[in-house]
Amino acid sequence: MSTNSVTTAVEKADHQVSDVTLRNRLLDALTVSSGAVDTVSFIALGKVFSAFMTGNIAFLGMAIASTTGSTTYGVVPPRVISVLAAMAGFAGGIYLATKIVRRFEQSAANKNQQPTGVVWPRQTTLALSISLLAHLCFVLIWFATSARPGGSVIPVLLATWALAMGMQSAAVRQLDVPGIFTTAATATFIFLFGDWAYNRPLTSEEHSRLRGVLVSLAIGATAGGLLLIHAPIYAPVLPFVITIGVVVTAARAFRYDDEAQESRGNVPLAA
């Protein structure tokens, strides 16, 4: 093997490692965003999540049970309409983003432009870009109500933000990174502790990735809570700005043209 070939192989490997590291940091950022979203949703929008659908299903059951005329241990559950609005918005976001991704993939395949080994595909950035419209709508409505939305507006806000979170979840799913969804930590716990039970040692990259998600979710939740306390009008701006940053960074950092694919070796990369 020539010296040039060795140098090229090393450069390709460096590109791949660098791309994976950047991808993980972008996933951390999206997790911070969803942590802030759920904190603001739960506190300010009637104890309903915009991203964590497992919690909403439990809340829906509580709300239905409360229709019998009593509360569970004195806890007042959220309104059924609010929970259903969030669930419908999230489902709609997943459906919309998945349709966008599939159409993009089919179009690329028809043109024989579907790259392989891409750490962050273009369709993920596209879906996240469109989710910004839902974020923007939420921010505008929030500003219009001076951070104090009424009962009739809350379901609209929940559906809007859940739409954005559903699109984010579907976009991240395209990356096929084990244990990472950015909108909940349940899968991360399953992946982490399940592998420990099987005595399969995690790599340093896996440790960093999983730890980053858990820490980022806590950071986002804390930041969202602090904003609600000290500057409630700007609380939804944080996830909006973070998502913009992720979209811009991904669009600039990951190239998808043939020349870029050739420079990266066009080699499939394990998550």
Model feature map: region roles:
Residues 2-271:
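Alpha-helical transmembrane segments of multi-pass membrane proteins
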